[in-house]
Amino acid sequence: DYFWKPTDPPYTVKRPIERRLELMEKELDREAVGTVLSGALDGWGDPLIPRFSLAVRLEVEQSVRLERLRARELAAFGERILPGGDMYENHREFMEWAARYDTAGPEQRSLARQKTWETGLPCPRLVLDGAAGLEENVARIREEWGKQK
């Protein structure tokens, strides 16, 4: 994880932007074939933009996205995120924040802010349907990637 420092409980202390970029650049320089980078870089990752060859955004209905987040969090942290657990409050705040993604403005990481950021990318952009099957989405990425060569 480039964004968060390793802490317990996790996801509570952000790395300084300079350190995030340093770690990512080091990793990207190591890869000979290419790298798939997952996550939102808007607001801090602009120095990496020249290295992008394709940008992919996965969209899915809010209810599906939130259920997937809940399931992921429960699988990763178990009882720690349930009422009485040491991560319960952080998890509750995270889910409230995530629920605002589709409707929030640029004051937080949101769909609106990410769409605006994407307009400045010099590489092709692809929007995938998160409700589609994995194989279908991988095929669309490969098809778009093939156009780049």
What are the language-model segments listed below?
Residues R51-F52, L121:
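Short, structured coil segments at secondary-structure junctions
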Residues L54, E59-S110:
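A glycine- and Lys/Arg-enriched "phosphate-lid" helix/loop adjacent to the NTP-binding pocket
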Residues D1-E25:
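Conserved substrate/cofactor phosphate-moiety recognition/catalytic segment
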Residues A40-P47:
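Switch II of P-loop NTPase G domains
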Residues E31-T35:
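Loop/turn-to-beta-strand initiation segments
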Residues L23-M24, W44, N137:
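Short acidic active-site motifs
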Residues E96-K149:
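NTP-dependent small-molecule kinase module
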Residues L28-R30, I49-P50:
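A short, aliphatic-rich alpha-helical micro-motif
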